[in-house]
């Protein structure tokens, strides 16, 4: 009932709860960031989010293919260790910096994080936004890059410049199209404050 009050159109309750779920032989996931990790795995399977291994990415770069490696980790993680060709584009910032970071629609965009979760989420976000480029996540992220025998750079000091007006306009246009497609409405700051009491 509470979910419906919050505006959810469809909601249901699992009869018997978690105990019956486990008794039926299904698994429950717990641990650090388990909801996010589970959601990313589900999203990748349901949406068929493309992914490439470090070897496949390295091969494409060696063949001269245009590739943009968007490292979507927070700046501190990027600074500590990053793929040499990586570009810092933290999380959702990759959307509103996209046009500045990837000016050619022919460029293959690869999103990577430390392991894979945020890379999957960001790749699917860019796909859903309708960017003109092919997009994939890196399987296993930065750690898998290293385990595959490729170098990392440490103590990176490069920073991504603030987004241009054109990049922000591009992101806004694509976000509005996505919201319209899924019938998502917006609230302003005053309405949000009213909800918060």
PLM-predicted stretches and their roles:
Residues 1-197:
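Cytosolic catalytic domains that perform sulfur/thiol-centered chemistry
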């Amino acid at each position: 009932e509470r979910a419906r009050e919050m505006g959810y159109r469809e909601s249901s309750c699992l009869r018997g709860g978690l105990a019956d779920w486990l008794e039926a032989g299904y698994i429950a996931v717990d641990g650090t960031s388990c909801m996010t990790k589970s959601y990313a795995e589900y999203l990748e399977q349901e949406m068929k989010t493309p992914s490439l291994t470090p070897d496949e990415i390295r091969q494409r770069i060696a063949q001269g293919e245009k590739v943009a490696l968007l490292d979507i980790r927070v700046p501190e993680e990027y600074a500590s260790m990053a793929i040499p060709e990586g570009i810092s584009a933290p999380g959702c910032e990759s959307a509103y910096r996209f046009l500045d970071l990837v000016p050619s629609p022919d460029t293959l965009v690869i999103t990577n994080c430390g392991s894979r979760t945020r890379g999957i989420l960001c790749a699917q976000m860019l796909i859903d936004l309708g960017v003109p480029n092919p997009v994939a996540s890196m399987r296993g992220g930065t750690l898998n890059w290293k385990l595959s025998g490729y170098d990392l750079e440490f103590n990176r000091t490069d920073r991504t410049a603030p987004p241009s007006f054109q990049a922000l306009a591009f992101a806004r246009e694509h976000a509005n199209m996505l919201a319209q497609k899924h019938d998502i409405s917006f609230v302003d700051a005053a309405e949000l404050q009213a909800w918060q009491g």
